[in-house]
């Protein structure tokens, strides 16, 4: 009898994965989703933190369920938010890094989102806090209305910061309007050479951490309303007021906090309250915000009728304040995991994930199920009794059974995980984790104190052990990729790549299938594997733009300024890996000078080749750098029309690429390199263009050369 009962319960829980959770006579729960920023696995008390106190977050775990194997689909902010809202892996759309402040809306307005899904079931929907997914159809010029935006993705109401607390513009947006802006003083984006006229913003000290200077002029009143030290208080007040104003309809509140993203600017009441400096004080402010939301639900009388989910967009970042918390107070933001934000190691994407729903979720319970933030779409569809079509379930898996029960088997067959670099796209299946390259695939700064300190150097610095790392560097002879048994070795101390070739082969097949789905620009053929480093090699084609003269000529800069376009480095910035160039020289928009010690993404401009007339065949070359809309190489007709183009993969390493020239035989063409980005991965590197053509001595007439 007992065995029969257990079998019946197991069947009922497992069947939830395939059938709607709510029936017609069920009252749908309210849903509150709190999405913290850069909160690491070890930043919360219920996940082992001892230098901070998080009673409100810990209460959610005490009254709900804590997951120990939850992940963000990306170890980076923008793509993680894309995955959360759409249920789609962001790499499929070429989204690898943070979007530029002027970025268009990255989410197709025809795509189903969790807000649209819930709105179809009668939910009131709102979004508060960090957006960082862009506005508008093309480049955002900040002219009102800011559409498409949150309201076009299913949110009835939005109030928050348009980008992030570390990047401009430093203003609030309400729905599709900039709060406090008037028609006679509009917000204006300023080009780099005009930024002496920016509008003043809240002054900060070095101790608060990294913040990008303002790039905008105008909107003086809007800027005055934004204060870094009251940002969290403002968003909490707006969110709780919205809860208080709800009527009888169920509601969905998505609160994307700016805590604990740099700069670390806790309100005065929280300063000095933790045992790990401003880093911990900011966590205390985050915990207070969670408490305010819970108090609002209780005051409204709906706390027991609300599913509350608390999680983070990615792992903790070892920035200046993270280093201060470790060096001076012993706080380990990602617990004993290897790695940090941006990287493929566990510390980059294993995140806190807690769900509370009285009467449905067992209080104080823990789940070891493998889940991901990309799974919320399918899970909320099941919760509200809405079937998804097959296309909408490709990446998002219904993990609701793991929230409300104890499934005996894994709900996910495998999970694709994306760090900042496309070369390090990874796959998790069961206990196995394959990272298809060496190192972390994230930031690679080698010196403590810097904002980008991470990778092997930082791992050694904090005392992590890994069989591939010796004294902060990847050891000579280390395997070309990484395989870890996370069941036996969650800290990723031993790379088993050479010991289990069959497992590597199986997981690599899954990765190859995933890579084949990545959105590519028309006509561009770029591999996801690094091009090999080779010596200067005379080509057998009639044209060779390989920059081996050490000079830019015959190419020209037609827009912007660059410090050192023709590079000759033998190793990459940060991680020290060998530069995979052809010969000695290459063209890059990353280097400010010949002896620069770090990259300079702030440079922008356009570089063009002379005109040429293709004779057929293909053009082969290498491309590296950012994967965003603002950094790319393009093949153009003489009138400037871009007919083929390609981007990097958010990696300094160059990828093989080729363009088919046969459609353009006899036409005047040119190559254009565009860098319009000034933030992370805001650069382009190209090398070794080989093709058959007649090179002309003139340039496109529409471009004024410098």
Q: Residue ranges of each PLM-predicted region?
A:
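Extracellular carbohydrate recognition and processing domains
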Residues: 636-669, 674-684
